[in-house]
Protein backbone atom coordinates (compact mmCIF):
# COMPACT_ATOMS: atom_id res chain seq x y z
CA UNK A 1 0.00 0.00 0.00
CA UNK A 2 1.54 3.41 -0.79
CA UNK A 3 2.47 5.67 2.06
CA UNK A 4 0.52 8.71 0.80
CA UNK A 5 -2.90 7.08 0.53
CA UNK A 6 -4.28 9.06 3.50
CA UNK A 7 -2.75 12.36 2.28
CA UNK A 8 -3.98 13.28 -1.23
CA UNK A 9 -2.08 15.93 -3.13
CA UNK A 10 -3.43 19.47 -3.17
CA UNK A 11 -0.75 21.52 -5.01
CA UNK A 12 -0.49 19.81 -8.40
CA UNK A 13 -2.56 17.49 -10.56
CA UNK A 14 -0.59 14.27 -10.40
CA UNK A 15 -3.50 12.26 -9.01
CA UNK A 16 -4.54 10.84 -12.39
CA UNK A 17 -1.01 9.41 -12.90
CA UNK A 18 -1.06 7.43 -9.68
CA UNK A 19 -1.27 3.65 -9.94
CA UNK A 20 -4.74 2.42 -8.84
CA UNK A 21 -4.93 0.33 -5.69
CA UNK A 22 -4.50 -3.39 -6.01
CA UNK A 23 -7.57 -4.15 -3.87
CA UNK A 24 -11.12 -2.95 -3.86
CA UNK A 25 -12.13 -0.30 -1.40
CA UNK A 26 -14.07 -2.68 0.85
CA UNK A 27 -11.24 -5.22 1.08
CA UNK A 28 -8.70 -2.48 1.77
CA UNK A 29 -10.82 -1.05 4.58
CA UNK A 30 -11.30 -4.55 5.98
CA UNK A 31 -7.56 -5.21 6.11
CA UNK A 32 -6.94 -1.73 7.58
CA UNK A 33 -9.43 -2.30 10.40
CA UNK A 34 -8.04 -5.74 11.13
CA UNK A 35 -4.44 -4.47 11.18
CA UNK A 36 -5.39 -1.69 13.59
CA UNK A 37 -7.11 -4.09 15.99
CA UNK A 38 -4.48 -6.83 15.92
CA UNK A 39 -1.50 -7.74 13.73
CA UNK A 40 -2.46 -10.03 10.84
CA UNK A 41 -1.61 -13.71 10.95
CA UNK A 42 1.22 -15.02 8.76
CA UNK A 43 -1.20 -17.02 6.61
CA UNK A 44 -3.33 -13.93 5.92
CA UNK A 45 -0.23 -11.95 4.92
CA UNK A 46 0.87 -14.66 2.49
CA UNK A 47 -2.51 -15.00 0.77
CA UNK A 48 -2.81 -11.21 0.65
CA UNK A 49 0.49 -11.12 -1.24
CA UNK A 50 -0.71 -13.75 -3.71
CA UNK A 51 -3.87 -11.72 -4.49
CA UNK A 52 -1.85 -8.81 -5.91
CA UNK A 53 -2.28 -8.12 -9.59
CA UNK A 54 0.90 -8.47 -11.71
CA UNK A 55 0.83 -4.87 -12.94
CA UNK A 56 3.93 -2.74 -12.40
CA UNK A 57 3.50 0.87 -11.23
CA UNK A 58 3.47 3.60 -13.84
CA UNK A 59 6.47 5.81 -14.29
CA UNK A 60 6.08 9.28 -12.73
CA UNK A 61 4.91 12.04 -15.01
CA UNK A 62 7.41 14.76 -15.96
CA UNK A 63 5.00 17.47 -17.10
CA UNK A 64 4.50 20.56 -14.99
CA UNK A 65 1.31 21.83 -13.42
CA UNK A 66 -1.29 23.43 -15.71
CA UNK A 67 -2.18 26.14 -13.22
CA UNK A 68 1.08 28.08 -13.61
CA UNK A 69 3.74 28.58 -16.25
CA UNK A 70 6.55 28.45 -13.73
CA UNK A 71 7.84 25.09 -12.48
CA UNK A 72 5.99 23.81 -9.50
CA UNK A 73 7.43 22.80 -6.16
CA UNK A 74 7.48 19.12 -7.20
CA UNK A 75 9.51 19.96 -10.33
CA UNK A 76 12.00 21.91 -8.29
CA UNK A 77 12.29 19.04 -5.82
CA UNK A 78 12.80 16.63 -8.71
CA UNK A 79 15.65 18.78 -10.01
CA UNK A 80 17.18 18.83 -6.53
CA UNK A 81 16.91 15.08 -6.22
CA UNK A 82 18.37 14.57 -9.70
CA UNK A 83 21.38 16.63 -8.73
CA UNK A 84 21.85 15.41 -5.18
CA UNK A 85 20.46 11.91 -5.64
CA UNK A 86 17.04 10.61 -4.63
CA UNK A 87 18.49 8.06 -2.22
CA UNK A 88 20.00 10.82 -0.08
CA UNK A 89 16.66 12.61 0.26
CA UNK A 90 14.77 9.43 1.04
CA UNK A 91 17.36 8.30 3.57
CA UNK A 92 17.60 11.75 5.19
CA UNK A 93 13.81 11.81 5.43
CA UNK A 94 13.22 8.26 6.60
CA UNK A 95 16.49 7.38 8.31
CA UNK A 96 17.24 10.37 10.52
CA UNK A 97 19.62 10.01 13.43
CA UNK A 98 16.79 10.19 15.99
CA UNK A 99 14.68 7.43 14.45
CA UNK A 100 17.50 5.23 13.21
CA UNK A 101 17.28 2.74 16.08
CA UNK A 102 13.48 2.64 15.80
CA UNK A 103 13.68 1.92 12.07
CA UNK A 104 16.19 -0.86 12.60
CA UNK A 105 13.99 -2.44 15.26
CA UNK A 106 10.93 -2.26 12.98
CA UNK A 107 12.19 -3.01 9.47
CA UNK A 108 14.93 -5.59 10.12
CA UNK A 109 12.61 -8.52 10.71
CA UNK A 110 11.62 -11.70 8.95
CA UNK A 111 10.27 -10.72 5.53
CA UNK A 112 8.31 -13.97 5.18
CA UNK A 113 6.19 -14.00 8.35
CA UNK A 114 6.22 -10.51 9.87
CA UNK A 115 6.46 -8.32 6.78
CA UNK A 116 3.01 -6.77 6.96
CA UNK A 117 3.13 -6.16 10.71
CA UNK A 118 6.45 -4.33 10.31
CA UNK A 119 5.06 -2.37 7.37
CA UNK A 120 2.08 -1.33 9.49
CA UNK A 121 4.38 -0.06 12.24
CA UNK A 122 6.53 1.75 9.71
CA UNK A 123 3.47 3.31 8.13
CA UNK A 124 2.37 4.53 11.54
CA UNK A 125 5.76 6.16 12.17
CA UNK A 126 5.79 7.79 8.72
CA UNK A 127 2.24 9.08 9.16
CA UNK A 128 3.23 10.69 12.48
CA UNK A 129 6.23 12.34 10.81
CA UNK A 130 4.06 13.58 7.95
CA UNK A 131 1.63 15.08 10.45
CA UNK A 132 4.52 16.90 12.11
CA UNK A 133 5.82 18.07 8.72
CA UNK A 134 2.43 19.45 7.71
CA UNK A 135 2.74 21.95 10.54
CA UNK A 136 6.04 23.17 9.12
CA UNK A 137 4.64 23.21 5.57
CA UNK A 138 3.19 26.67 6.00
CA UNK A 139 6.61 28.05 6.89
CA UNK A 140 8.26 26.46 3.84
CA UNK A 141 5.47 27.73 1.54
CA UNK A 142 6.82 31.30 1.78
CA UNK A 143 10.33 30.28 0.71
CA UNK A 144 9.02 28.13 -2.18
CA UNK A 145 6.83 31.03 -3.41
CA UNK A 146 9.95 33.19 -3.65
CA UNK A 147 11.65 30.48 -5.71
CA UNK A 148 8.67 30.31 -8.07
CA UNK A 149 8.88 34.08 -8.73
CA UNK A 150 12.48 33.69 -10.05
CA UNK A 151 13.31 32.11 -13.48
CA UNK A 152 14.14 28.37 -13.48
CA UNK A 153 17.78 27.56 -12.91
CA UNK A 154 19.84 25.02 -14.79
CA UNK A 155 19.81 21.49 -13.36
CA UNK A 156 23.63 21.50 -13.22
CA UNK A 157 23.61 24.06 -10.38
CA UNK A 158 22.08 23.49 -7.00
CA UNK A 159 18.89 25.62 -6.51
CA UNK A 160 19.97 27.37 -3.34
CA UNK A 161 17.48 30.33 -3.65
CA UNK A 162 19.69 32.75 -1.73
CA UNK A 163 20.50 30.15 0.84
CA UNK A 164 16.89 29.53 1.81
CA UNK A 165 16.58 26.15 -0.01
CA UNK A 166 19.46 24.07 1.30
CA UNK A 167 19.72 20.45 2.42
CA UNK A 168 17.58 21.18 5.43
CA UNK A 169 14.99 22.73 3.13
CA UNK A 170 14.82 19.56 1.11
CA UNK A 171 14.32 17.64 4.30
CA UNK A 172 11.55 20.04 5.35
CA UNK A 173 9.63 19.82 2.05
CA UNK A 174 10.25 16.16 1.36
CA UNK A 175 6.62 15.31 2.17
CA UNK A 176 5.69 16.89 -1.15
CA UNK A 177 8.23 14.68 -2.86
CA UNK A 178 6.61 11.65 -1.27
CA UNK A 179 3.36 12.61 -2.94
CA UNK A 180 5.01 12.09 -6.32
CA UNK A 181 4.05 8.77 -8.05
CA UNK A 182 7.68 7.69 -7.93
CA UNK A 183 7.33 7.43 -4.17
CA UNK A 184 5.14 4.35 -4.67
CA UNK A 185 8.32 2.40 -5.36
CA UNK A 186 9.91 0.88 -2.27
CA UNK A 187 13.31 2.19 -1.28
CA UNK A 188 15.85 -0.67 -1.08
CA UNK A 189 17.39 0.86 2.02
CA UNK A 190 14.11 0.31 3.88
CA UNK A 191 13.92 -3.40 3.09
CA UNK A 192 17.57 -4.46 3.18
CA UNK A 193 19.53 -3.94 6.43
CA UNK A 194 22.38 -1.89 4.99
CA UNK A 195 24.61 0.09 7.38
CA UNK A 196 22.73 3.36 7.64
CA UNK A 197 25.54 5.53 9.00
CA UNK A 198 27.77 4.73 6.03
CA UNK A 199 25.05 5.46 3.50
CA UNK A 200 24.15 8.77 5.13
CA UNK A 201 27.76 9.85 5.34
CA UNK A 202 28.33 8.87 1.70
CA UNK A 203 25.21 10.76 0.63
CA UNK A 204 26.13 13.91 2.53
CA UNK A 205 29.67 13.97 1.13
CA UNK A 206 28.67 15.71 -2.19
CA UNK A 207 27.09 18.60 -0.29
CA UNK A 208 30.28 19.08 1.68
CA UNK A 209 32.27 19.05 -1.58
CA UNK A 210 30.01 21.81 -2.95
CA UNK A 211 30.49 24.02 0.09
CA UNK A 212 34.25 23.50 0.38
CA UNK A 213 36.81 24.33 -2.28
CA UNK A 214 39.27 21.57 -1.38
CA UNK A 215 38.14 18.16 -0.09
CA UNK A 216 39.47 17.11 3.33
CA UNK A 217 42.50 14.85 3.30
CA UNK A 218 42.53 13.86 6.96
CA UNK A 219 39.69 11.39 6.47
CA UNK A 220 41.55 9.61 3.66
CA UNK A 221 44.76 9.49 5.64
CA UNK A 222 42.97 8.22 8.72
CA UNK A 223 41.13 5.61 6.65
CA UNK A 224 44.41 4.49 5.04
CA UNK A 225 46.04 4.26 8.46
CA UNK A 226 43.09 2.28 9.80
CA UNK A 227 43.29 -0.04 6.78
CA UNK A 228 47.01 -0.57 7.40
CA UNK A 229 46.33 -1.33 11.04
CA UNK A 230 43.61 -3.79 10.07
CA UNK A 231 45.96 -5.50 7.62
CA UNK A 232 48.64 -5.74 10.32
CA UNK A 233 46.10 -7.19 12.73
CA UNK A 234 44.98 -9.71 10.12
CA UNK A 235 48.59 -10.73 9.49
CA UNK A 236 49.17 -11.14 13.22
CA UNK A 237 46.02 -13.23 13.54
CA UNK A 238 47.08 -15.41 10.61
CA UNK A 239 50.50 -15.91 12.17
CA UNK A 240 48.88 -16.82 15.49
CA UNK A 241 46.59 -19.29 13.78
CA UNK A 242 49.52 -20.88 11.95
CA UNK A 243 51.47 -21.15 15.18
CA UNK A 244 48.50 -22.73 16.90
CA UNK A 245 48.15 -25.24 14.08
CA UNK A 246 51.84 -26.11 14.36
CA UNK A 247 51.50 -26.64 18.09
CA UNK A 248 48.52 -28.90 17.53
CA UNK A 249 50.38 -30.97 14.98
CA UNK A 250 53.39 -31.30 17.27
CA UNK A 251 51.13 -32.43 20.11
CA UNK A 252 49.49 -34.96 17.83
CA UNK A 253 52.85 -36.31 16.79
CA UNK A 254 53.99 -36.47 20.38
CA UNK A 255 50.85 -38.32 21.40
CA UNK A 256 51.30 -40.71 18.49
CA UNK A 257 54.94 -41.32 19.49
CA UNK A 258 53.85 -41.85 23.08
CA UNK A 259 51.29 -44.37 21.95
CA UNK A 260 53.91 -46.20 19.92
CA UNK A 261 56.30 -46.24 22.89
CA UNK A 262 53.58 -47.45 25.26
CA UNK A 263 52.60 -50.18 22.78
CA UNK A 264 56.23 -51.31 22.47
CA UNK A 265 56.64 -51.33 26.28
CA UNK A 266 53.46 -53.35 26.73
CA UNK A 267 54.57 -55.83 24.07
CA UNK A 268 57.99 -56.19 25.67
CA UNK A 269 56.47 -56.57 29.16
CA UNK A 270 54.14 -59.38 28.10
CA UNK A 271 55.61 -62.87 28.46
CA UNK A 272 56.01 -64.79 25.22
CA UNK A 273 53.77 -67.82 25.47
CA UNK A 274 53.26 -68.23 21.75
CA UNK A 275 54.90 -71.69 21.47
CA UNK A 276 52.57 -73.03 24.16
CA UNK A 277 49.56 -71.72 22.31
CA UNK A 278 50.85 -73.29 19.12
CA UNK A 279 51.25 -76.59 20.92
CA UNK A 280 47.60 -76.48 21.82
CA UNK A 281 46.69 -75.98 18.20
CA UNK A 282 49.00 -78.68 16.88
CA UNK A 283 47.72 -81.61 18.89
CA UNK A 284 48.32 -84.75 16.77
CA UNK A 285 45.19 -86.46 15.46
CA UNK A 286 45.82 -90.15 15.05
CA UNK A 287 43.72 -92.32 12.82
CA UNK A 288 43.59 -96.03 13.04
CA UNK A 289 45.70 -97.81 10.45
CA UNK A 290 43.29 -100.43 9.19
CA UNK A 291 45.88 -101.87 6.80
CA UNK A 292 48.39 -102.63 9.55
CA UNK A 293 49.00 -106.19 10.66
CA UNK A 294 47.61 -107.53 13.97
CA UNK A 295 51.14 -108.03 15.30
CA UNK A 296 51.68 -104.27 15.75
CA UNK A 297 48.55 -103.86 17.89
CA UNK A 298 50.22 -103.78 21.29
CA UNK A 299 52.92 -101.32 20.23
CA UNK A 300 50.29 -99.06 18.62
CA UNK A 301 48.17 -98.89 21.77
CA UNK A 302 51.20 -98.21 23.96
CA UNK A 303 52.35 -95.38 21.67
CA UNK A 304 48.86 -93.82 21.78
CA UNK A 305 48.85 -93.92 25.55
CA UNK A 306 52.26 -92.25 25.66
CA UNK A 307 51.10 -89.47 23.34
CA UNK A 308 47.94 -88.92 25.38
CA UNK A 309 50.04 -88.60 28.51
CA UNK A 310 52.22 -86.01 26.77
CA UNK A 311 49.09 -84.06 25.72
CA UNK A 312 47.87 -84.08 29.31
CA UNK A 313 51.21 -82.67 30.43
CA UNK A 314 51.01 -79.93 27.83
CA UNK A 315 47.52 -78.96 29.03
CA UNK A 316 48.77 -78.83 32.62
CA UNK A 317 51.60 -76.53 31.56
CA UNK A 318 49.15 -74.27 29.73
CA UNK A 319 46.92 -73.99 32.80
CA UNK A 320 49.91 -73.18 35.01
CA UNK A 321 51.16 -70.53 32.60
CA UNK A 322 47.69 -68.96 32.51
CA UNK A 323 47.68 -68.63 36.27
CA UNK A 324 51.12 -66.98 36.26
CA UNK A 325 50.62 -64.77 33.22
CA UNK A 326 49.22 -61.25 33.35
CA UNK A 327 45.53 -60.66 32.50
CA UNK A 328 44.92 -60.26 28.79
CA UNK A 329 42.20 -58.67 26.81
CA UNK A 330 38.77 -60.21 26.30
CA UNK A 331 39.51 -61.24 22.70
CA UNK A 332 42.67 -63.12 23.62
CA UNK A 333 40.87 -64.85 26.51
CA UNK A 334 38.07 -65.97 24.21
CA UNK A 335 40.59 -67.32 21.72
CA UNK A 336 42.40 -69.20 24.48
CA UNK A 337 39.15 -70.69 25.75
CA UNK A 338 38.21 -71.80 22.26
CA UNK A 339 41.59 -73.40 21.70
CA UNK A 340 41.55 -75.25 25.01
CA UNK A 341 38.04 -76.48 24.28
CA UNK A 342 39.18 -77.81 20.92
CA UNK A 343 42.16 -79.55 22.51
CA UNK A 344 40.00 -81.18 25.17
CA UNK A 345 37.46 -82.28 22.58
CA UNK A 346 40.16 -83.91 20.48
CA UNK A 347 41.53 -85.64 23.55
CA UNK A 348 38.09 -86.99 24.47
CA UNK A 349 37.56 -88.36 20.98
CA UNK A 350 40.92 -90.06 20.99
CA UNK A 351 40.22 -91.67 24.38
CA UNK A 352 36.83 -92.87 23.16
CA UNK A 353 38.42 -94.39 20.09
CA UNK A 354 41.02 -96.17 22.20
CA UNK A 355 38.31 -97.52 24.50
CA UNK A 356 36.47 -98.92 21.49
CA UNK A 357 39.63 -100.59 20.32
CA UNK A 358 40.18 -102.14 23.77
CA UNK A 359 36.59 -103.39 23.91
CA UNK A 360 36.92 -104.93 20.48
CA UNK A 361 40.07 -106.74 21.61
CA UNK A 362 38.15 -108.28 24.53
CA UNK A 363 35.54 -109.83 22.22
CA UNK A 364 37.04 -113.11 20.91
CA UNK A 365 35.06 -113.14 17.68
CA UNK A 366 35.95 -109.56 16.63
CA UNK A 367 39.44 -109.42 18.04
CA UNK A 368 41.26 -109.67 14.73
CA UNK A 369 38.77 -107.56 12.77
CA UNK A 370 40.38 -104.13 12.33
CA UNK A 371 37.46 -102.69 10.35
CA UNK A 372 34.73 -103.55 12.85
CA UNK A 373 32.24 -100.70 13.28
CA UNK A 374 31.56 -99.21 16.66
CA UNK A 375 27.92 -100.34 16.76
CA UNK A 376 28.89 -103.97 16.14
CA UNK A 377 31.63 -103.74 18.72
CA UNK A 378 29.17 -102.46 21.32
CA UNK A 379 26.57 -105.11 20.49
CA UNK A 380 28.99 -108.04 20.51
CA UNK A 381 30.66 -106.79 23.66
CA UNK A 382 27.26 -106.68 25.40
CA UNK A 383 26.48 -110.24 24.33
CA UNK A 384 29.89 -111.40 25.42
CA UNK A 385 29.47 -109.77 28.82
CA UNK A 386 26.09 -111.48 29.31
CA UNK A 387 27.54 -114.87 28.36
CA UNK A 388 30.41 -114.38 30.75
CA UNK A 389 27.96 -113.59 33.55
CA UNK A 390 26.07 -116.83 32.83
CA UNK A 391 29.30 -118.77 32.88
CA UNK A 392 30.17 -117.18 36.18
CA UNK A 393 26.86 -118.23 37.75
CA UNK A 394 27.25 -121.73 36.39
CA UNK A 395 30.71 -122.03 37.77
CA UNK A 396 29.53 -120.79 41.15
CA UNK A 397 26.88 -123.51 41.27
CA UNK A 398 29.41 -126.16 40.32
CA UNK A 399 31.78 -125.06 43.06
CA UNK A 400 28.98 -125.28 45.62
CA UNK A 401 28.12 -128.82 44.49
CA UNK A 402 31.73 -129.82 44.68
CA UNK A 403 32.02 -128.45 48.20
CA UNK A 404 28.93 -130.42 49.26
CA UNK A 405 30.32 -133.56 47.70
CA UNK A 406 33.59 -132.98 49.51
CA UNK A 407 31.82 -132.70 52.85
CA UNK A 408 29.97 -135.96 52.22
CA UNK A 409 33.17 -137.78 51.38
CA UNK A 410 34.83 -136.51 54.55
CA UNK A 411 32.00 -137.84 56.70
CA UNK A 412 32.10 -141.28 55.06
CA UNK A 413 35.85 -141.50 55.60
CA UNK A 414 35.41 -140.70 59.29
CA UNK A 415 32.81 -143.46 59.72
CA UNK A 416 35.09 -146.00 58.10
CA UNK A 417 37.95 -145.10 60.43
CA UNK A 418 35.72 -145.47 63.49
CA UNK A 419 34.45 -148.88 62.39
CA UNK A 420 37.94 -150.29 62.01
From Swiss-Prot:
Chain intervals with Basic and acidic residues compositional bias: 249-262
Keyword Nucleus: yes
Protein name: Transcriptional regulator Myc-B
Acidic residues bias (residue ranges): 225-246
Transmembrane annotation, as ranges: none
Entry keywords, A to Z: Activator, DNA-binding, Nucleus, Transcription, Transcription regulation
Highest taxon, organism lineage: Eukaryota
Function: Transcription factor that binds DNA in a non-specific manner, yet also specifically recognizes the core sequence 5'-CAC[GA]TG-3'. Activates the transcription of growth-related genes.
Name of the gene: myc-b
Family matches, as Gene3D superfamilies: Helix-loop-helix DNA-binding domain
Amino acid sequence: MPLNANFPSKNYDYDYDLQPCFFFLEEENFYHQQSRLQPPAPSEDIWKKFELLPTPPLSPSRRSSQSSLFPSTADQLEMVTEFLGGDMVNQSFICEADDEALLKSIVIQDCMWSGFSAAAKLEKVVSEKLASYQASRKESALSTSQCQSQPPQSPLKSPSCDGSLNLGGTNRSSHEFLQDPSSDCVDPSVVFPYPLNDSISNASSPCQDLMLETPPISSNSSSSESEDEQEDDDDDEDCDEEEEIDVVTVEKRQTASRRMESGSHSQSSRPHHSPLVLKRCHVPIHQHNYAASPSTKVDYVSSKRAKLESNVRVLKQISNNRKCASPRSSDSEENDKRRTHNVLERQRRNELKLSFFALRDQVPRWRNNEKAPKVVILKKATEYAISMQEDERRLIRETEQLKYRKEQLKQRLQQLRNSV
